Amino acid sequence: MAEYDLTTRIAHFLDRHLVFPLLEFLSVKEIYNEKELLQGKLDLLSDTNMVDFAMDVYKNLYSDDIPHALREKRTTVVAQLKQLQAETEPIVKMFEDPETTRQMQSTRDGRMLFDYLADKHGFRQEYLDTLYRYAKFQYECGNYSGAAEYLYFFRVLVPATDRNALSSLWGKLASEILMQNWDAAMEDLTRLKETIDNNSVSSPLQSLQQRTWLIHWSLFVFFNHPKGRDNIIDLFLYQPQYLNAIQTMCPHILRYLTTAVITNKDVRKRRQVLKDLVKVIQQESYTYKDPITEFVECLYVNFDFDGAQKKLRECESVLVNDFFLVACLEDFIENARLFIFETFCRIHQCISINMLADKLNMTPEEAERWIVNLIRNARLDAKIDSKLGHVVMGNNAVSPYQQVIEKTKSLSFRSQMLAMNIEKKLNQNSRSEAPNWAAQDSGFY
């Protein structure tokens, strides 16, 4: 379903290396012409050092021989790599020393570590630039593990004021994402976010741009890390600077926020967050909508159950063709049906199983089994009258006291998030660089 594909929009905020997994996914889904996708890969590869990959793509796209320019570029890249390896070899040997490793693990002070290396191994300031260049070259060649390793060494040693400090954080995050090291990527994402948020030198426009990039890069982490669906809600919905970036620069991100809320495993948090999400979806409905956001609008704004059922069917097609959301399909459908059911039950005391099956896009037998499982798992206070084919709801009236308690809990949660954001703002550190990893040569695609 190319109509709802967001790859082109998202790719504008990603480093070109991060776009390759998205193109591979689209190729498998066959929703675009394969030759167009191959040409897209070739265009992306033109400004990287992954020459062998470019040659393979060229062979698949064209029947003629590999262009001379590509062969020449390969020779140049190999020569540059050998030169950088020779320059970096003495530096790498320093880090391979067991005593250096112990020092790196025991001290968090980059200056102290730098002084130690200078005393013991003759480490010099220019070695940092050499290390950074080599890490970046490794990244451009597609050796992400090497890039991550050298960028870690670089980050440990450089002060926050170094001209490549922020750039190296972007590179480390990209490398960990491309290696699918989700724990390390989550740590790097958190570190990068703190650096951006504490930067008092960047202009508001630069900060907005940095946060917009971070929002898009974070999708890889949030939809693969076990805690990702909690963290994405806290960041996108309850941190005003990031919600503002979404509303200003990339309202299409609401698709991912909505999916994270619907598939969140914490039922209490999910219900609490839904009210705030609905407000944002309503505010932005004039700038962005798709079946996923429209499903929420149909159900919680218009109480249009037929419309919600129709949108849920469309959501399946959207999810299965979305690189980030395809793994959420089962959770989404299951929880969306539960949302429809819960909302429907607030209005009706006695419900026909046939009517319910129609609302949930299930057969009557499937609907009955589904409700039985809900009752068995203590997620539903109801009884089934098999003779009449009815579901009779229990007495779910909420006392005024309970309503006050629930509203207080919600207010407490929001106050806590606000206090955390204020505390972070007060503890600002000055950082001056803009996120330009892979931007000097290849730019953000």
From Swiss-Prot:
Domain PCI intervals: 221-398
Q: Which residues carry this modification: N-acetylalanine?
A: A2
Q: Where in the cell is it found?
A: Cytoplasm; Nucleus, PML body
Task: Name a single GO cellular component.
Answer: PML body
Q: Which residues carry this modification: Phosphotyrosine?
A: Y445
Q: Which residues carry this modification: Phosphoserine?
A: S399, S442
Alphabetical list of CDD domains matching this protein: eIF3E
Q: Where is this region: Sufficient for interaction with EPAS1?
A: 4-128
Q: Which GO terms describe its biological process?
A: formation of cytoplasmic translation initiation complex; nuclear-transcribed mRNA catabolic process, nonsense-mediated decay; translational initiation
The keyword Acetylation is assigned to this record: yes
GO terms of molecular function: translation initiation factor activity
Please name the PANTHER family in this protein's record: EUKARYOTIC TRANSLATION INITIATION FACTOR 3 SUBUNIT E (PTHR10317)
Assembly and interaction partners: Component of the eukaryotic translation initiation factor 3 (eIF-3) complex, which is composed of 13 subunits: EIF3A, EIF3B, EIF3C, EIF3D, EIF3E, EIF3F, EIF3G, EIF3H, EIF3I, EIF3J, EIF3K, EIF3L and EIF3M. The eIF-3 complex appears to include 3 stable modules: module A is composed of EIF3A, EIF3B, EIF3G and EIF3I; module B is composed of EIF3F, EIF3H, and EIF3M; and module C is composed of EIF3C, EIF3D, EIF3E, EIF3K and EIF3L. EIF3C of module C binds EIF3B of module A and EIF3H of module B, thereby linking the three modules. EIF3J is a labile subunit that binds to the eIF-3 complex via EIF3B.
Q: What does this protein do?
A: Component of the eukaryotic translation initiation factor 3 (eIF-3) complex, which is required for several steps in the initiation of protein synthesis. The eIF-3 complex associates with the 40S ribosome and facilitates the recruitment of eIF-1, eIF-1A, eIF-2:GTP:methionyl-tRNAi and eIF-5 to form the 43S pre-initiation complex (43S PIC). The eIF-3 complex stimulates mRNA recruitment to the 43S PIC and scanning of the mRNA for AUG recognition.
Protein name per Swiss-Prot or TrEMBL: Eukaryotic translation initiation factor 3 subunit E
- Source organism: Bos taurus
Gene for this chain: EIF3E
